[in-house]
Amino acid sequence: MIIYRLTTSKFSGDLSGEGAKIYGGRWNPVGLAALYLSEFISLSILEILVRANKYNSPDSYSLLTIQLPEDSVNSIELKKLKTGWQNHIEYTRSIGEDFIRMNQALVLKVPSAIVPQEHNYLINPAHKDSKKIKIIVVELLELDKRLFQI
């Protein structure tokens, strides 16, 4: 399976999940390492933009094309999430926390809060299969500055 990670270039080689551990994310609480990836490059960009504002200058971003074993993916179906889940971050964090702490799979496929019909992937970097994560390509991705003026 091929998925994508968009990150500031200075962290392009870091698959430790330390950023999410420090700041937390939609699917993980502060203190618990996780990696976030997307099924599409465009969704990766949207996930960056949703946290940006018009006063942020776009940093240098790198796009990582990553290969994962398909047999290491658990999924959460959109219909199984409670109504309004996008607005209940403690709810989604508890799901991700349970996934990471149970340590039964490397990857959790989750709906995107921005485009629920598309998916992000939460990776548990502490899982024994994390060594199977293969970075295929790392390339500089220059985001159109107009995206940050919205």
Where in this protein do the model-derived segments appear?
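Short glycine/proline-enriched, acidic/aromatic patches that form the donor-sugar handling elements
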Residues: G24
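Short, intrinsically disordered, mixed-charge
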Residues: L43-S57, L140
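Extended catalytic/binding region for NAD+/ADP-ribose chemistry, centered on the ART fold
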Residues: W27-E47, Y121-A126
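Active-site and NAD+-binding cores of ADP-ribose-processing enzymes
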Residues: I2-G17, P29-V30, S57-I150
